[in-house]
Design a protein with these regions (language model features):
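Low-complexity/repetitive intrinsically disordered segments
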Residues: 1-29, 151, 168-191
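Surface-exposed interfaces of beta-sheet-rich extracellular modules
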Residues: 1-8, 85-121
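Tandem-repeat architecture and repeat-register "anchor" residues
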Residues: 4, 15-17, 26, 39-41, ...
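Short strand-edge motifs at loop-to-beta-strand transitions and within beta-strands
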Residues: 10-12, 23-25, 75-80, 124-126, ...
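Conserved "repeat-terminator" motif of extracellular CCP/Sushi domains
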Residues: 14-34, 40, 128-149, 155
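Structural motif
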Residues: 32, 38-51, 147, 153-166
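Short, surface-exposed beta-strand/strand-loop-strand elements in extracellular ectodomains
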Residues: 49-58, 105, 164-173
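Tryptophan-paired
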Residues: 56-95, 170-191
Length: 191
């Protein structure tokens, strides 16, 4: 036999001594496989102590287990074996304690074909392609990023304000980025 790859042509030479014998060539198909896991990442300014939960995947022969991650520690789930041609339905992230509405959650995978990137939505899927089995492990990472807003303090003076009036507004506290103290004289708006 000139080779053992059943996906290319091979030549079998039958010798004179094999004449009349039953010769059997067996082709064995082995499904391509790799390992797969879910992972959790937290962006800067995530609230320490928030706990995100990812339920098990569905749709695979070997589904992932539940993954819990406490901010702000990145966490990798347990590896499972997956096969080319499978499609994993990825779980929607939940949170307790903490408020999921305070975060955006994106999901990204380093191999395969991902459909959907909102980690808070159900129905995102990952198709395990034959090419994806070259990556080991395939990792789908859910990343939480705190939502932000702009806080601006302002002082406006009414129509009957005196030019001799003044006001000072102190700095805010307790935020990641706090405002600073500012003062203004009567009749002059400030922010």
């Amino acid at each position: 036999l000139s080779g053992t790859n059943g996906q290319v042509s091979n030549t079998l030479v039958i010798g004179a001594g094999d004449s009349g014998k039953a010769i059997v060539c067996t082709y064995t198909n082995t499904r391509k496989s790799t390992t797969f896991r879910l992972a959790k990442a937290w962006s800067a300014n995530s609230t320490a102590g928030n706990i995100a939960s990812l339920a098990a995947t569905t749709g695979l022969i070997n589904n992932t287990a539940v993954l819990n991650s406490t901010a702000s520690t990145a966490t990798n789930g347990t590896l499972v074996t997956v096969f080319a041609g499978e499609t994993a339905t990825l779980p929607a992230e939940t949170m307790s304690p903490g408020t999921l509405a305070n975060y955006t959650t994106t999901v990204s995978c380093d191999a395969g074909t991902l459909t959907g990137t909102n980690g808070q939505s159900a129905g995102n899927t990952l198709a395990i392609t034959a090419a994806a089995t070259a990556t080991s492990p395939i990792t789908c990472t859910y990343t939480n990023t705190p939502k932000t807003a702009t806080l601006q303090l302002a002082k406006a003076w009414g129509a009957n304000s005196s030019a001799s009036d003044s006001a000072s507004i102190g700095a805010t506290t307790g935020g990641t980025n706090n405002t600073t103290l500012f003062s203004t004289a009567g009749g002059t708006a400030a922010n």
